[in-house]
Amino acid sequence: MAAVGSGGSNAAAGPGAVSAGSLEPGTASAAHRRLKYISLAVLVVQNASLILSIRYARTLPGDRFFATTAVVMAEVLKGLTCLLLLFAQKRGNVKHLALFLHEAVLVQYVDTLKLAVPSLIYTLQNNLQYVAISNMPAATFQVTYQLKILTTALFSVLMLNRSLSRLQWASLLLLFTGVAIVQAQQAGGGGPRPLDQNPGAGLAAVVASCLSSGFAGVYFEKILKGSSGSVWLRNLQLGLFGTALGLVGLWWAEGTAVARRGFFFGYTPAVWGVVLNQAFGGLLVAVVVKYADNILKGFATSLSIVLSTVASIRLFGFHVDPLFALGAGLVIGAVYLYSLPRGTAKAIASTSASASASTSGPCTHQQPPGQPPPPKLSSHRADLSTEPFLPKSVLVK
C-alpha cells in the first residue's frame, strides 16, 4: 500500500490529470528541481526551528513545563495524525480501516513488537534532547548533535557490515575534531552563564542522545529491511509504543510533580509550538525526504547550523568567537563531505586522472561524435529506502 505523498499509482487521477511520464523533459526537470528546493527549505526550517523553539520554551521566565509531558503529547498527536491519514487512504471507511489495523497491528504482532525497541530508544532520546538543550546554547547543541553521524556510521559498520570510504572516515575524524573544539570553547568560554544550566549535564545528554540515535536508526533499518508497511502505519505503531513508554517515563521521573500540578502545567503557546513541531514536522519531512538526496540533506544540515547560530545571536545573545566558528566550520565541512556518494569521489578521481593524462599525451577515451554522453552518477545510496520510515519529528534531522 502506497503512503500518502510517497508515490503510488496515478490510475485514480481524473481525466485531466497529467502523469509524470507525459511531461516534457524540461518541464519534468524544472518540477523536480523545484521539489528539491522545497525539500531543502523544509529540512532546514524543521532542523533549526525545533531546536530553537525548545531552547526558547525552556528558557522563558515563569513556570517551566514538564518535558516528559511534551514528549507524550507529541507522540499522541503524531499517532492521531497517522491514523487520520490511514483513514483517508481507506476512503473514510471505518470498517476497512479497522480490519486493516487488526491485520497489520494485531495479527502481524511480531512485526509490531519489533518496533518496541526503537520506540523505547526514540522516547529516551526525546527526553535527553530536552535535557541537553536546556543546559547548552541552541547553536552549540546543533553542532554537537552532529555526532549522531559518527555513531550511526559506527553502528552501521558493526551491525550491518557496511563499509565506509576513506573520504567518509576522514570526514568523521573531521567531525569529531570540530565538535571537540566547540565543546572546548563551551567549557572554557567566558561570560556569564545562567545558574540553572549545567554544561556538563548538557554534554552528557547530547552524547547519550547521539548514541541512542545511531543505534536506533541502524536497528530500525535492519528490522524493516523488506517490510511492506507504509510510512503512516510504521509511524502509527511507533506512536502507540512511544505514548505508552512516554507515560511510563513520565510516571517514573516526574509522576509526583505532574499529579500535584497537572499534566499541562507551564504550557504556553511557545510550548504548544514545540509539541506541534515535534509531532508534525517530522511527518512532513518523511514526505519530502524522497526528493532529497544525500548531498541535499547534508547541505540542509549545514544550513540549519548556520541558521541556528544566527538566530541564537538574535534571540539569546549568543556570542560567536573564532574558536566556535572554527569548530562549526569543520563540522559543516565534515557533514558535506560525508554526504557525498562514493561515485562522486570516484568520478573526481577519474576526472583528475584524465586531466593528467591529457597533459602527457592524447586522450584515448574520447566520446565518439554523435553519441549521447554517459549517464550521470546517482547521488542516492542503496540504503535510503528505509529512511522515510524514520520518525523525523523526534530525530531533529
Curated annotation (Swiss-Prot):
Membrane topology note: Multi-pass membrane protein
Swiss-Prot/TrEMBL catalytic activity: UMP(out) + UDP-alpha-D-galactose(in) = UMP(in) + UDP-alpha-D-galactose(out); UDP-N-acetyl-alpha-D-galactosamine(in) + UMP(out) = UDP-N-acetyl-alpha-D-galactosamine(out) + UMP(in); UMP(out) + UDP-alpha-D-glucose(in) = UMP(in) + UDP-alpha-D-glucose(out); UMP(out) + UDP-N-acetyl-alpha-D-glucosamine(in) = UMP(in) + UDP-N-acetyl-alpha-D-glucosamine(out)
Main location as per UniProt: Golgi
Domain of life: Eukaryota
Keywords: Antiport, Golgi apparatus, Membrane, Sugar transport, Transmembrane, Transmembrane helix, Transport
Keyword Transmembrane assigned: yes
Transmembrane segments: 3-23, 37-57, 65-85, 97-117, 140-160, 169-189, 200-220, 238-258, 269-289, 315-335
GO annotations of cellular component type: Golgi membrane
Annotated region described as Disordered, given as residue ranges: 1-21, 355-397
Locations listed in the record: Golgi apparatus membrane
Disulfide pattern: none
GO molecular function: antiporter activity; UDP-galactose transmembrane transporter activity
GO BP, sorted A to Z: UDP-galactose transmembrane transport
Composition skew (Low complexity), residue ranges: 9-21
Function, in words: Transports uridine diphosphate galactose (UDP-galactose) from the cytosol into the Golgi apparatus, functioning as an antiporter that exchanges UDP-galactose for UMP. It is also able to exchange UDP-galactose for AMP and CMP, and to transport UDP-N-acetylgalactosamine (UDP-GalNAc) and other nucleotide sugars. As a provider of UDP-galactose to galactosyltransferases present in the Golgi apparatus, it is necessary for globotriaosylceramide/globoside (Gb3Cer) synthesis from lactosylceramide.
Subunit (UniProt): Interacts with SLC35A3; the interaction is reduced in the presence of SLC35A4. Found in a complex with SLC35A3 and SLC35A4.
Family the entry assigns: Belongs to the nucleotide-sugar transporter family. SLC35A subfamily.
Full protein name: UDP-galactose translocator
Organism taxonomic ancestry: Eukaryota, Metazoa, Chordata, Craniata, Vertebrata
